Swiss-Prot record:
Residues 144-165 have a biased composition (Low complexity). Its EC number is 3.1.27.-. One of its GO terms (cellular component) is virion component. SUPFAM superfamilies: PIN domain-like. It comes from Human herpesvirus 2 (strain HG52) (HHV-2). The record marks 215 as: Necessary for the endonuclease activity. Belongs to the herpesviridae VHS protein family. Pfam families: XPG_I. This is Virion host shutoff protein. The lineage of its organism: Viruses, Duplodnaviria, Heunggongvirae, Peploviricota, Herviviricetes.
Amino acid sequence: MGLFGMMKFAQTHHLVKRRGLRAPEGYFTPIAVDLWNVMYTLVVKYQRRYPSYDREAITLHCLCSMLRVFTQKSLFPIFVTDRGVECTEPVVFGAKAILARTTAQCRTDEEASDVDASPPPSPITDSRPSFAFSNMRRRGHAFAPGDRGTRAAGPGPAAPSGAPSKPALRLAHLFCIRVLRALGYAYINSGQLEADDACANLYHTNTVAYVHTTDTDLLLMGCDIVLDISTGYIPTIHCRDLLQYFKMSYPQFLALFVRCHTDLHPNNTYASVEDVLRECHWTAPSRSQARRAARRERANSRSLESMPTLTAAPVGLETRISWTEILAQQIAGEDDYEEDPPLQPPDVAGGPRDGARSSSSEILTPPELVQVPNAQRVAEHRGYVAGRRRHVIHDAPEALDWLPDPMTIAELVEHRYVKYVISLISPKERGPWTLLKRLPIYQDLRDEDLARSIVTRHITAPDIADRFLAQLWAHAPPPAFYKDVLAKFWDE
């Protein structure tokens, strides 16, 4: 899943940055967690180490490890589920649904040109309660003002714990969801949305700072992603780093790399990131340009470089944008600046040389040894929040100007998906206000008796169950109320 070749490209071109993600003292950093994606990655990693564990045992082992790291790093997870909290919802929105609906409507490319390019409106598009939201509210209750939560649902009848994508995968998804709810963690019931789309909604409504996933299609939706939280410095990819490296605006990025989305192009018909860039005759920045970019990033990591103004192609001259010409115009004159002197390496013992101000985002020593004044962390945090509020993606609809009129099934699928992404992340104008509706967040009351009942019911070996329960009580303390966490992180 994701953009084919994007992860390899990001690693090769040093776009995977390692950051501490340490918020000021007393703050929790909210992070959306694509639960299936993250747990899948952990289970694949650990199931060979513990061949005697069944699905529930290996799932709980991975869950305990993940929750312990969240606690250690002061991260506040908001878990996003696939197919609802009971794993029974049909997914009717998103990339896979758009592909299925389009291929059912059009059997040949000739039919595609006569079909409406608009996808069905997502639940976020309409301001009225949708069918998907109605389902969410029937299964759980959103917090009323002053309410601290609702009692989690009981274990219920014995039900399968979610179908694994491969027979060899030992991931009990429904079991994982029930344990998290019993422990009182915040979650999103994505209902008929894909988890990726719900994560993007949380990011663009300034609910979370990052999305924890390895799916690079979140980058196509303009999000910053965290790949792994278990390391000292957390590997992240920022969408704006990609835009600066490619020297293009977000609408260009969305229109160009939608061709690489694996869920939209079956039977290996997608293009790779390298193929798309090669067709555009894109060239990587020179070393001097990379050094200047690194210097600008360190000087002011909160400022976003203004994107170049582009002129639309004349009407009637061509139906597909000439990306070669556009990118050639954008990189023209980049080498007119004089060569920068090599950057001095930082002083490992004392920080940057020449008395430069130390930044908590710079990687100098292991994070547990970095001593940064809390006042500096607060100032950097406020700058980050101000930057996120200032750099809302308002120009996403311009991506449609860079797409050709759909003449084939593939182009129709891409056109519909781009429109769908725009409906997810672009705020709507309502008089003097710009609004983007956020999916409701739920947080059940913590019930340790219920959690113990769920664990002992599915893990029949008493010694294994007791060991995991002891880990949960030790490393997964009662989480804070999500509204308090979000208010402190974004508003103080």
